[in-house]
C-alpha cells in the first residue's frame, strides 16, 4: 500500500437503534448479509486498519474489524464515536462511515480517498441541498479540537465539522442513503 494514501477506516455502530426498536443496525440483514459487511467486504484497498465503535455485540463485530472499541461515554451521539475512533487510529487520517450506509458505500469510500488533499484537516460528503450523512475523513491532528468540542457539550456533527474546518464535497444524494428506518431496506 502507498503509505501516503493509507488511512484508518472507522465505522460508527454505536447508535441506540431507536427507530429499529433498539436493534443493533450493524447486525440487520440486508441483501443477504449484515449491514456492516456492506462497508467492510471487500476490504477497501487503502484501509490500513478497520476500527468499529459499537455499543454492544463486540464479539460479532470482531469478524469485520481489526479492532473493536466502545465509546467512553455511551449514548452521546456520533461525535462520541468519532472521538473514540480518532483516539484509536494509527494512521494520519481517519475515514468515518456509518454502519448503516446502504446508498453507495464503494463510491463514498472512493470519493473520500480521491478528494483528500494534503492540506485538508477534514472533508465530508454532502448532497446538493446541504444534507449530509456521517461520511467524512479527518486528520488525526484534529483530535484535540474534537475532544474540546465534545467535552464542551457539542453533540451535532455539523458543529464538529465547523470546529475542525471541514471542506464539503457534494455528491449524489442517493450515495448517502442509510438504513434509518426498517422501510429503507424493504424490497
Across the structure, where does each feature detected by a protein language model lie?
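Nucleotide and nucleotide-moiety/phosphate-recognizing core
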Residues: 2-154, 158-179, 183
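Long, highly charged low-complexity segments
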Residues: 186-187
Amino acid at each position: 500500500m502507498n503509505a501516503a494514501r493509507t488511512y484508518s477506516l472507522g465505522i460508527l455502530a454505536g447508535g441506540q437503534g431507536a427507530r429499529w426498536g433498539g436493534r443493533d443496525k450493524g447486525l440487520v440483514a440486508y441483501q443477504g448479509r449484515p449491514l456492516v459487511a456492506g462497508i467492510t467486504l471487500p476490504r477497501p484497498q487503502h484501509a490500513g486498519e478497520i476500527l468499529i465503535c459499537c455499543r454492544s455485540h463486540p464479539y460479532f463485530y470482531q469478524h469485520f474489524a481489526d479492532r473493536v472499541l466502545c465509546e467512553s461515554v455511551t449514548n452521546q451521539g456520533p461525535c462520541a464515536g468519532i472521538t473514540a475512533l480518532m483516539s484509536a487510529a494509527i494512521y494520519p487520517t481517519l475515514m468515518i462511515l456509518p454502519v448503516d450506509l446502504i446508498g453507495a458505500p464503494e463510491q463514498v469510500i472512493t470519493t473520500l480517498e480521491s478528494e483528500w488533499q494534503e492540506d485538508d484537516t477534514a472533508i465530508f460528503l454532502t448532497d446538493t441541498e446541504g444534507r449530509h450523512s456521517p461520511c467524512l475523513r479527518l486528520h488525526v491532528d484534529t483530535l484535540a479540537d474534537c475532544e474540546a468540542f465534545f467535552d464542551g457539550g457539542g453533540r451535532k456533527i455539523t458543529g464538529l465539522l465547523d470546529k475542525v474546518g471541514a471542506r464539503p464535497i457534494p455528491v449524489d444524494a442517493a450515495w448517502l442513503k442509510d438504513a434509518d428506518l426498517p422501510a429503507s431496506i424493504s424490497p
